Amino acid sequence: MSSHIAKSESKTSLLKAAAASGGSRAPRHSSARDPGLRGRRLPGPCPDSPATCGDPSSRRPLCRPVPRDEGARGSRRGLPQAHCRPRETLPPARGRDGEERGLAPALSLRGSLRSRGRGDPAPAGTPEADPFLHQLRPMLSSAFGQDRSLRPEEIEELREAFREFDKDKDGYINCRDLGNCMRTMGYMPTEMELIELSQQINMNLGGHVDFDDFVELMGPKLLAETADMIGVKELRDAFREFDTNGDGEISTSELREAMRKLLGHQVGHRDIEEIIRDVDLNGDGRVDFEEFVRMMSR
């Protein structure tokens, strides 16, 4: 009798426990059955857990996959990015050698300056050397730029172009041939420029242009073309102005004398040493032509 009562009590307790656990269990797929909950994300743990996910179609990825054409360079085709980091914070692209792309060449050049006896060198662009280098460049621009006079070879170039279009050899070309002459010399004037030029010639020059007028018209264009271009020939000519003894190198005394002539005042010995220290890459205390070119193109 006692054993029968114990079995009944155990069954009763099991039924009560099952009822208690079943009453607290959430209905499965409630979001799919209830129309009011469709399209809403259920709060709770990770949506990938099968115990808490609703309809599999209602799952949302943690990060929107990036289209193929917007993906990061080097990522596998068709796969989303690993995380949603903004594109601006991505590290810069690197080449095969491991160096970052897009670095200015001047950084590597300036970083290659050697250590000097008086301590670390003043990097390019320091206050010690810059004022004088900034004064030297306008001097060369005035010698080879737009505010200079035409050189003999440039005047000869204009003369040859003028002769080619002076068909009757009377020393004049008409305004209609001036546009073709300009195109022959490599200039491409617009129609508006040609109209204005023709009006100027017809009003002031009687419709014809002699050689002096031609030089006055074309000279500024020729100078403007070469204003920002200092070629090897011009740089060698400028280097010879500094290298007075012709040994192929500019010494401290030669640089000081050349700067005195160009700037119109004497430059101190210490300032000259700072300039040479700033541009002397091989450390011999003198400036050769290659270093001079680097100095003027910086």
Swiss-Prot record:
GO terms for cellular component: axon; cytoplasm; cytoskeleton; dendrite; glutamatergic synapse; Golgi membrane; neuronal cell body; nucleus. It is found in: Cytoplasm; Cytoplasm, Cytoskeleton. GO terms for molecular function: calcium channel regulator activity; calcium ion binding; calcium-dependent protein binding; identical protein binding; nuclear localization sequence binding; protein domain specific binding; transmembrane transporter binding; type 3 metabotropic glutamate receptor binding. The keyword Cytoplasm applies. Ca(2+) 1 binds at D166, D168, D170, Y172, D177. Residues 1-10 have a biased composition (Basic and acidic residues). Residues 11-25 have a biased composition (Low complexity). SMART domains: EFh. One of its GO terms (biological process) is postsynapse to nucleus signaling pathway. It holds the Pfam family EF-hand_7. Somatodendritic compartment of neurons. Restricted expression in retina to a subpopulation of amacrine, bipolar, and ganglion cells. According to PubMed:11906216, expression is heterogeneous within brain regions and their major cell types and does not match with those of marker proteins for characterized neuronal subpopulations. Isoform 2: Minor isoform expressed in the brain, in the granule cell layer of the cerebellum, at low level. Not developmentally regulated. Isoform 3: Minor isoform expressed in the brain, in the granule cell layer. of the cerebellum, at low level. The modification Phosphoserine is found at S251. Keywords: Calcium, Cytoplasm, Cytoskeleton, Developmental protein, Metal-binding, Phosphoprotein, Repeat, Sensory transduction, Vision. Residues 1-131 are annotated as: Disordered. Gene3D superfamilies: EF-hand (1.10.238.10). SUPFAM superfamilies: EF-hand. Ca(2+) 2 binds at D243, N245, D247, E249, E254. Residues 153-188, 207-224, 230-265, 267-298 form the EF-hand domain. CDD domains: EFh. Ca(2+) 3 binds at D280, N282, D284, R286, E291. Phosphorylated. The phosphorylation regulates the activity. EF-1 binds magnesium constitutively under physiological conditions, EF-3 and EF-4 bind calcium cooperatively and EF-2 binds neither calcium nor magnesium. Modulates calcium-dependent activity of inositol 1,4,5-triphosphate receptors (ITPRs). Inhibits agonist-induced intracellular calcium signaling. Enhances inactivation and does not support calcium-dependent facilitation of voltage-dependent P/Q-type calcium channels. Causes calcium-dependent facilitation and inhibits inactivation of L-type calcium channels by binding to the same sites as calmodulin in the C-terminal domain of CACNA1C, but has an opposite effect on channel function. Suppresses the calcium-dependent inactivation of CACNA1D. Inhibits TRPC5 channels. Interacts with ITPR1, ITPR2 and ITPR3. The strength of this interaction inversely correlates with calcium concentration. Interacts with CACNA1A (via C-terminal CDB motif) in the pre- and postsynaptic membranes. Interacts with CACNA1C. Interacts with CACNA1D. Interacts (via EF-hands 1 and 2) at microtubules with MAP1LC3B. Interacts (via EF-hands 1 and 2) with NSMF (via the central NLS-containing motif region), the interaction occurs in a calcium dependent manner after synaptic NMDA receptor stimulation and prevents nuclear import of NSMF. Interacts with MYO1C and TRPC5. Interacts with SPACA9. This is Calcium-binding protein 1. It comes from Rattus norvegicus (Rat).
